[in-house]
Amino acid sequence: MLRFAPSPTGDMHIGNLRAAIFNYIVAKQQYKPFLIRIEDTDKERNIEGKDQEILEILKLMGISWDKLVYQSHNIDYHREMAEKLLKENKAFYCYASAEFLEREKEKAKNEKRPFRYSDEWATLEKDKHHAPVVRLKAPNHAVSFNDAIKKEVKFEPDELDSFVLLRQDKSPTYNFACACDDLLYKISLIIRGEDHVSNTPKQILIQQALGSNDPIVYAHLPIILDEVSGKKMSKRDEASSVKWLLNQGFLPVAIANYLITIGNKVPKEVFSLDEAIEWFSLENLSSSPAHFNLKYLKHLNHEHLKLLDDDKLLELTSIKDKNLLGLLRLFIEECGTLLELREKISLFLEPKDIVKTYENEDFKERCLALFNALTSMDFQAYKDFESFKKEAMRLSQLKGKDFFKPLRILLTGNSHGVELPLIFPYIQSHHQEVLRLKA
């Protein structure tokens, strides 16, 4: 079984979605069940409704799952596993207070050495009646694993100490809950971000202590860097939020296409998730950081907009009139996002705001003069844009730039865009909606 294990503590990050996509693809390729595990044990950081938001995003991306579990529902199992480790003398109670540990951390910092927990501290404050934590005994050997992307990764004994499994309130730590659940659901491969590399030796040690003989294969994805700063994209970067990208009008299929493409060798530029299942391979992923490029994502989105079938295009633009499909196709040529396309069609059909667009009083007067001329014309009487244009120029007594700029604004709501002769048939058929001024 493969899994995707998000925490409901904020908006879904593109790095998390990338991991979800890759786990889903490999599960499909290997005909293995796919598990979604909501890691909700950190009650203080959980945000109500974020779990459902994550699931909705996965559905939008075309990702389905065979099983959905909430980690908090397994808390009795986690405590049972901790008790097993205590009985087998693989774990121990530690009574050291947070204040004591903080002093030791400060001492290590002042002495310019890494902080490592010492097992000798476990019972120093036992008589103070602190509720103890449960720690796994530190290993006396190195922990290594062969990462499917990063190759061999090794942690020496002095890099690992006796770490906490259960907190004072008997709630499991992230690494303990994660390791227990991966065993419980027989997870065979974990694809996740490289920020989890330091968690992996701890999870391996927990699984070994619990008697696991089936090592999990790990694949840690390189981080995604911001295109401007070159730094890791954080949750503070708008474009790192999948929700933000969707709200900006990027299609789910285009986002998935892009996240599969970056840092990867792909056989074609534009593809669907189902197509990627046919050829995706972890071996083709680079071990170097990927650079986020919003401009390229926009390009891919433009290509996917062109591939939308008629019914989907009408649905996504909230246009009920099928006679406008041809106009939408023309507008797509100039749009990178669904938001831009919606804006173009809205400006075309809505009353025109010349107050917002006019440059000066003279320009406003030209717009009004042309508007009056246009309202006196029978749009259906002209066989083409050329004959319509000549009559409009004659009636308005305008020409050149003084004519064309007001004309485009009055007919499209925009000062630039698709050639007017191309969209003139749609202007003719919808002139009563098109030729209106905002009050």
Curated annotation (Swiss-Prot):
Sequence motif 'HIGH' region, residues: 6-16
Domain of life: Bacteria
Motif 'KMSKS' region: chain residues: 232-236
Catalytic activity field: tRNA(Glu) + L-glutamate + ATP = L-glutamyl-tRNA(Gln) + AMP + diphosphate
Annotated ATP binding sites: K235
Entry keyword set: Aminoacyl-tRNA synthetase, ATP-binding, Cytoplasm, Ligase, Nucleotide-binding, Protein biosynthesis
Annotated localization: Cytoplasm
E.C. number(s) listed in UniProt: 6.1.1.-
Molecular function, one GO term: glutamate-tRNA ligase activity
A Pfam family it matches: Anticodon_2
Positions of transmembrane segments: none
GO biological process, one term: glutamyl-tRNA aminoacylation
Cellular compartments per GO CC: cytosol
Function: Aminoacylates tRNA(Gln) with glutamate. Does not aminoacylate tRNA(Glu).
Quaternary data: Monomer.
Recorded family membership: Belongs to the class-I aminoacyl-tRNA synthetase family. Glutamate--tRNA ligase type 1 subfamily.
Protein name (record): GlutamylGlutaminyl-tRNA synthetase
Organism of derivation: Helicobacter pylori (strain ATCC 700392 / 26695)
Lineage: Bacteria, Pseudomonadati, Campylobacterota, Epsilonproteobacteria, Campylobacterales
Gene that encodes the chain: gltX2
